[in-house]
């Protein structure tokens, strides 16, 4: 879940509630991604594909989808999740290996803070085709008063979302993270400075679930 309000105590409280009424802070945003797909849909790349849920959801909308992850177990899980579709490739390729303007959609969920942000965004700008889209669900370290306010909102809404989705307490209790985790280092404002400098016109917003979103359409 990452860094949170009140020296981490808020995060500990939320984690305890989330263990009783679990929901995925990352999967929650799949619907946002599916609602913002580009008009041309040849190739999509999900960077940091994890267990493959988003790759599987994108498959019906694109000619081909590539799920990328450096973790071999995550690639294995994505392969299993997508075993019923024929237009998916799972790979450890990195963005720098794609040709210029060859991809219509690049997605990243809770991944960008693992990467060198400036290098990654430059590769995104190069690889995306005209009118292609970048859709990011990210995490940032809370530092400004606005960041802390959004953390407070997430602390309040987190158990409500979990309770609505899973009204009965989970008997399993707290489970280990299903994918490698890392707390973010850059703040929202620091991420935004890089985004604005490299991807002019991108939209970045705070969201619930201790997340933010970045949306950018490459000029046609």
Locate the predicted segments by residue.
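C-terminal alpha-helical "lid/dimerization" subdomain adjacent to the S-adenosyl-L-methionine
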Residues: 141-194
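A short, conserved alpha-helix within the catalytic core of class I
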Residues: 115-124
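Class I SAM-dependent methyltransferase Rossmann-like catalytic core
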Residues: 11-25
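Conserved beta-strand signature within the Rossmann-like core of class I S-adenosyl-L-methionine
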Residues: 132-138
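Conserved class I S-adenosyl-L-methionine
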Residues: 42-50
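Class I SAM-dependent methyltransferase SAM/SAH-binding core
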Residues: 51-53, 57-96
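Conserved alpha-helix/loop element of class I SAM-dependent methyltransferases that forms part
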Residues: 24-42
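A conserved beta-strand element that flanks and buttresses the S-adenosyl-L-methionine
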Residues: 107
């Amino acid at each position: 879940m990452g860094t949170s309000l009140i020296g981490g105590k808020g995060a500990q409280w939320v984690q305890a509630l989330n263990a009783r009424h679990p929901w995925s802070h990352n999967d929650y945003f799949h619907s946002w991604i599916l609602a913002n797909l580009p008009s041309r849909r040849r190739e999509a790349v999900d960077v940091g594909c994890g267990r493959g849920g988003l790759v599987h959801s994108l498959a019906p909308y694109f000619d081909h989808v590539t799920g990328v992850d450096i973790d071999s177990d995550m690639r294995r899980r994505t392969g299993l999740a997508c075993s019923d579709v024929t237009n998916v490739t799972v790979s450890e390729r990195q963005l720098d290996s794609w040709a210029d303007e060859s991809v219509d959609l690049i997605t990243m969920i809770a991944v960008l803070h693992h990467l060198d942000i400036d290098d990654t965004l430059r590769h995104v700008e190069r690889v995306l085709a005209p009118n292609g889209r970048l859709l990011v669900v990210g995490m940032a370290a809370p530092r400004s008063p606005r960041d802390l306010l959004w953390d407070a909102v997430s602390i309040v809404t987190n158990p409500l979302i979990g309770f609505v989705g899973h009204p009965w307490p989970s008997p399993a209790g707290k489970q280990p993270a299903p994918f490698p985790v890392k707390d973010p280092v850059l703040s929202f404002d620091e991420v935004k400075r890089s985004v604005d400098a490299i991807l002019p016109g991108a939209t970045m917003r705070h969201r619930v679930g201790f997340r933010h979103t970045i949306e950018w359409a490459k000029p046609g």
